[in-house]
Amino acid sequence: MPTPLPSSSAWLAFADAARHSSRRGARLRVIEAAGLRVDLTAQAHSDDLDSAAEDLLAQQDFDNARAQLFDGGPANWTEHRPAWHTALRAARPPTPVAGAILGERDRLRRFVQDADMRGAYRHVLHLGIGGSDWGPRMVTRALRHNGLKREVRFASNVDSHAVADALHHLDPHDTLIIVASKSFTTTEPLANAEVAMNWLRNAGVADPVRQVVAITANVDAALDFGISPQHIFRFWDWVGGRYSLWSAIGLPVALALGCDALDELLAGAAAMDQHFLHTPMRRNAPLQMALAGVANRSVLGYGSLAITPYDSRLTHLVPWAQQLEMESLGKVAGHDGSPAGVPTGPVVWGMTGTDCQHTFFQWLHQDTAGAPVDFIVCEQADHPYDHFHKLLIANCLAQRAALLRGKPFDEALKEARLVESDPQQAEILAHHRVHPGGRPSTLIMLPRLSAHALGALLAMYEHKVFAQGVLWGINPFDQWGVEYGKALARNIIRELENPSSEVNQQDPSTRYWIDALRKQP
């Protein structure tokens, strides 16, 4: 069992080395991983930090934890089950689950190929939430420049405005409804499925269920819903929702972009799996990103991480990463239930570039807090405007350089004297122009935005988050905070829909709003 961090000599050595390591990019550090280039030059680094990191990983039993992840051990130790998403994308899945995985892959491919041959389903509406939504939504948006076989729309929020907008102008006689829910009890996809089914019925579709597909780990619940066995695609309890893109949850990707695109996405992720599994620590991209993340959060005191993809096609990457990181690492309890003892998961936020520069980069450059930044950009574009792509890359590199280098007072004063003749006013202006610099960042360069490169990028973030969980001694595969809120919502909806019932065990504010909403006509 990993040692509580604050009391361990390995942690104290790591923290001391991180505090005293260079944060000014004195040594170039670029790692190649599964076709990506990851530049960690602007993160804290020294030989002492590398040595301390190796000792910390040994203390936290990292090699054993990683082996459990890939071998189907109880990596999700609070729920006593594997977190075996790596098996889903392996070319040769592990023997215990190979038959099930390959069987579902084959069923999915035959379903898509049959729909293609029949020219069926010009439109697809995917109903999920969280992990069953963000992954396929992000991938179909990111790769649609390669051409769409079908229009795929997504609705996730229980706010029915969302599903109403998604259904607008679709042909009910040529639309496939996908209901994606691991438990098949989740409120949002089932509520939206009811709306979609009524839409089909009201349009005169004779047998609406024939146009509905379920993706779930709870086959019995999908059967009870009325969906035919041939239209139920399965994944398993050992696949976490936020890691489920690699399962049948990838069906909308195959319907929109083709089965070959989905295969390439899986292959890219599998290539990153092999890099993470076999590459030594000092050249291991996900592991180095994790070590930087732990140092930034737990030693250097940064409370958040900004992710800025300089590619408008990656607009949904930020919320995907938000769920991955914050649902995985927003915890405090270690293996024995005691607190981790150091700050853990950061807030994750961001926006695509260059919009981000005109929204929050002022804060990143000159606020007293600041935040580490992940810059993501493609070397090659998929449009013919080469000059403008170079302009995009130049902006990305310039913002990163400014965060790293900063602008000292002497340089700012020279600039100020060029525009302000009064010496006192020039000195005042110079203080406004100072940039502290030394702010950490990572640059991730994709060769181009292909399915393979995107799969590698997503898997790299998954492994980075896993490694941070191991280093902090927390379980990155459960989500008890999410479950607690869902349980409270079930109680509140019963009280809202039964005005005569007693409102019990609610705090004063919640009780006030339940009473007020009951009085609405």
UniProtKB/Swiss-Prot annotation:
InterPro entries: G6P_Isomerase, G6P_Isomerase_C, Phosphoglucose_isomerase_CS, SIS_dom_sf, SIS_PGI_1, SIS_PGI_2. GO terms for cellular component: cytosol. It is found in: Cytoplasm. Its EC number is 5.3.1.9. Its main location: cytoplasm. The active site is at residues 327, 358, 486. Pathway: Carbohydrate biosynthesis; gluconeogenesis; Carbohydrate degradation; glycolysis; D-glyceraldehyde 3-phosphate and glycerone phosphate from D-glucose: step 2/4. Gene3D superfamilies: 1.10.1390.10, Glucose-6-phosphate isomerase like protein, domain 1. GO terms for biological process: gluconeogenesis; glucose 6-phosphate metabolic process; glycolytic process. It holds the Pfam family PGI. Keywords: Cytoplasm, Gluconeogenesis, Glycolysis, Isomerase. Belongs to the GPI family. This is Glucose-6-phosphate isomerase.
